Amino acid sequence: MSRLLIFILTAVVLSVIIDILNNSKVEGQYCCYTCIPDCSKSCQDSGLRFKACIPYRSCLCQY
């Protein structure tokens, strides 16, 4: 029973994280909520590409 509960909780947490990442993609230079303004520039300064904004956190960059 406990393994099933852990599996269900893990699936719920992962689906919430994926949903947040999918909904937080922003077009243009500015991010959402309290993210760093000008995410594209922030990522480029690190040598990365802007991917998405994590609400209330920071920019999500990718190689």
Curated annotation (Swiss-Prot):
Tissue specificity field: Expressed by the venom gland.
Keyword set, alphabetical order: Disulfide bond, Ion channel impairing toxin, Neurotoxin, Potassium channel impairing toxin, Secreted, Signal, Toxin, Voltage-gated potassium channel impairing toxin
GO MF, one example: toxin activity
Disulfide bond positions: 35-53, 39-59, 43-61
Entry similarity comment: Belongs to the short scorpion toxin superfamily. Potassium channel inhibitor family.
Biological role stated in the UniProt entry: May block voltage-gated potassium channels (Kv).
Protein's name according to its UniProt entry: Potassium channel toxin MeuTXKalpha4
The organism of origin for this protein: Mesobuthus eupeus
Source lineage: Eukaryota, Metazoa, Ecdysozoa, Arthropoda, Chelicerata
